């Protein structure tokens, strides 16, 4: 077995160093037609009105249920109470160590969450906190338009928890699950035709 490697020497083009040489290089490339080919391609597509640009913010692309944006704390649909039971699993599994919560036991003996904060300066949006939550209390929402002076404006409990007014107006969207498909998933999947012939020679699809 021959273990010797064979190297091939490729002669590279010498880049011009002087100003005159660079100007000549630009002139040669312009005359050769590379510049005009690109301009003609842009002009042709513009005249055909073959535009694929999304006119944001008037037009917005649909987001997949698996999209991981700013976190949201959900409420129970039956009573409107907070779903979070203060188990602390999200705080323990967070690999960025950016989740903090303060809990205590109330008069009814149930654990209550007083403070729940996420440091979005360290969060990498891995989604582990949402996956491990047994009550689907913390999920990743679709809110990606987050213009603010500080990241802390989105990481407090009162910012992430569904407001009661919006909840009463049925404004809380249920989390479809990590395996959920997008609404237009069928149009994006290339379907393979399953055509075969029966013994009688009739074609079935």
Swiss-Prot record:
Any one of the GO CC terms: plasma membrane
Bilayer topology term: Peripheral membrane protein
Q: What is the lineage of its organism?
A: Bacteria, Pseudomonadati, Campylobacterota, Epsilonproteobacteria, Campylobacterales
Q: Which domain of life is it from?
A: Bacteria
Q: What is its main location?
A: membrane
Q: What does this protein do?
A: NDH-1 shuttles electrons from NADH, via FMN and iron-sulfur (Fe-S) centers, to quinones in the respiratory chain. The immediate electron acceptor for the enzyme in this species is believed to be ubiquinone. Couples the redox reaction to proton translocation (for every two electrons transferred, four hydrogen ions are translocated across the cytoplasmic membrane), and thus conserves the redox energy in a proton gradient.
The protein's name in its UniProt record: NADH-quinone oxidoreductase subunit I
Enzyme Commission no = 7.1.1.-
Q: Which co-factor is required? A: [4Fe-4S] cluster
Assembly and binders: NDH-1 is composed of 14 different subunits. Subunits NuoA, H, J, K, L, M, N constitute the membrane sector of the complex.
Question: Which Pfam families did the record assign?
Answer: Fer4_7
The answer on whether this UniProt entry bears the keyword Magnesium reads: no
Give the UniProt family note.
Belongs to the complex I 23 kDa subunit family.
Q: Which reaction does it catalyse?
A: a quinone + NADH + 5 H(+)(in) = a quinol + NAD(+) + 4 H(+)(out)
User: Annotated Gene Ontology MF terms?
Assistant: 4 iron, 4 sulfur cluster binding; iron ion binding; NADH:ubiquinone reductase (non-electrogenic) activity; quinone binding
Checking Gene3D superfamilies in the record gives: 3.30.70.3270
Localization: Cell inner membrane
